[in-house]
């Protein structure tokens, strides 16, 4: 919900000029790249070693929620850079471990392609709905409402992950 609107958040919510927002987004991109590399390369292996999927996915959701919280409570460009770090790491961990979780919950390994295709549709629909929901929220109440809703979605992700009974 936040990623697609970074420029607008920096300009309209934080109050930066186009030039300052461009600099902040450049810094955010570097921060995100670094933490995403670290998170992607380490989280899957750690999850395998622990034999657990839910804990890393819940940690990832918590990191995302912290990332969303920071610009909501601190309207500064620095809070957006912190957002990039926390949310970038959270998204990387979530992406790596969630893929392993998806494979673990497949009902029939012989139909993995079909089942993963269905999971991909669900993921794509969520990514498509995010900007639509964000646009509606901004239209209703500005960016102040976007952050708590994003936090709520991260918390809901934790709750739904806990409902999966077939994996630890």
List each model region and its residues.
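Short amphipathic helix-loop junctions that connect adjacent transmembrane helices
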Residues: 4-23
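Helix-to-loop junctions at the C-terminal end of transmembrane segments
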Residues: 38-52, 138
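C-terminal ends and interior cores of transmembrane alpha-helices
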Residues: 62-75
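A membrane-interface helix-boundary motif in multi-pass transporters
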Residues: 134-154
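Cytoplasmic membrane-interface "Motif A"-like loop-to-helix N-cap segments
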Residues: 49-61
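A late C-terminal transmembrane helix in Major Facilitator Superfamily
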Residues: 110-139
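Intracellular juxtamembrane helix-capping segments at the cytosolic ends
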Residues: 93-107
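Hydrophobic core of transmembrane alpha-helices in multi-pass small-molecule transporters
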Residues: 79-94
């Amino acid at each position: 919900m936040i990623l697609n609107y970074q420029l607008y958040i920096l300009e309209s919510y934080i109050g930066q000029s186009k030039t300052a927002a461009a600099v902040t987004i450049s810094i955010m991109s570097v921060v995100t790249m670094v933490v995403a590399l670290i998170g992607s390369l380490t989280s899957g292996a750690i999850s395998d070693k622990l034999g657990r999927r839910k804990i890393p996915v819940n940690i990832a959701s918590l990191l995302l929620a912290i990332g969303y919280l920071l610009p909501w409570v601190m309207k500064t460009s620095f809070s957006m850079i912190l957002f990039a770090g926390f949310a970038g790491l959270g998204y990387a961990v979530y992406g790596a471990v969630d893929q392993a979780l998806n494979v673990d919950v497949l009902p029939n390994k012989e139909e993995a392609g079909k089942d993963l295709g269905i999971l991909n549709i669900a993921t794509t629909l969520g990514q498509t709905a995010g900007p639509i929901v964000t646009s509606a929220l901004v239209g209703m109440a500005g960016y102040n409402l976007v952050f708590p809703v994003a936090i709520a979605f991260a918390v809901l992700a934790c709750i739904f992950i806990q409902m999966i009974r077939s994996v630890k």
